[in-house]
């Protein structure tokens, strides 16, 4: 079995593939203060509850945008699984040309998403990934990574509102019925959800104008399901796009 690990700034997503089939996946918090043994035991217990033996994990690949986490997860893989993980980074085979001024600057998760979307859908696409930051990445009809843009994520944008405006409460991410709201909580929810949907639609529209075509627009990431219904541009959600991309990249390097 193949263990894929996608380390984001806020959450870490793990998945186990048996061949091409994703048989289990989990989402845990990214905590750089945790020790090797704390992460090792957490992962061990996740597998145990899913009735997966640690000995069944024969291969591991990691995509990480939080460099200190590699100092934790690499030893975890070697100590608890006796496997040296493959790390997505410079020099790894992606099978995708990267048209970026400095390819080393591109976040591993962005490349992984691009690889997955082209392999899976076989067409040009814009991938919108709702994470700590929200990324917009364009893949050409020839399967080339052409770049994109990065916006503040919906969570950190909202945190700025809660922390900088002392009289405004924290609110849950849910969509109010009306944009012209009648109370403070609903007003904030309207601003956050509809405002962010407008940000997404605006950026996608400008990207399409610059590209001069009409690519598939696909969303992934933890909050995609909250924002997508309020957008006009996102056509579909693929929750497991990043995990699938990691599987593909591992295959191309094995």
From Swiss-Prot:
GO terms of molecular function: ATP binding; metal ion binding; pantothenate kinase activity
Localization annotation: Cytoplasm
UniProt keyword Phosphoprotein, yes or no: no
Subunit structure: Homodimer.
Catalysed reactions listed for this entry: (R)-pantothenate + ATP = (R)-4'-phosphopantothenate + ADP + H(+)
EC number per UniProt: 2.7.1.33
Organism in which the protein naturally occurs: Syntrophus aciditrophicus (strain SB)
Free-text function comment from the UniProt entry: Catalyzes the phosphorylation of pantothenate (Pan), the first step in CoA biosynthesis.
Pathway: Cofactor biosynthesis; coenzyme A biosynthesis; CoA from (R)-pantothenate: step 1/5
Protein name: Type III pantothenate kinase
Gene: coaX
Active site: 109
Chain sites annotated for binding substrate: 100, 107-110, 184
Main location: cytoplasm
InterPro entries to which the protein is assigned, alphabetical: ATPase_NBD, Type_III_PanK
Assigned protein family: Belongs to the type III pantothenate kinase family.
Residues the entry annotates as binding K(+): 129
Keywords annotated in UniProt: ATP-binding, Coenzyme A biosynthesis, Cytoplasm, Kinase, Metal-binding, Nucleotide-binding, Potassium, Transferase
One BP annotation, GO: coenzyme A biosynthetic process
Cofactor notes: A monovalent cation. Ammonium or potassium.
SUPFAM superfamilies named among the record's database cross-references: Actin-like ATPase domain (SSF53067)
Cofactor(s) in the UniProt record: NH4(+); K(+)
Entry binding sites for ATP: 6-13, 132
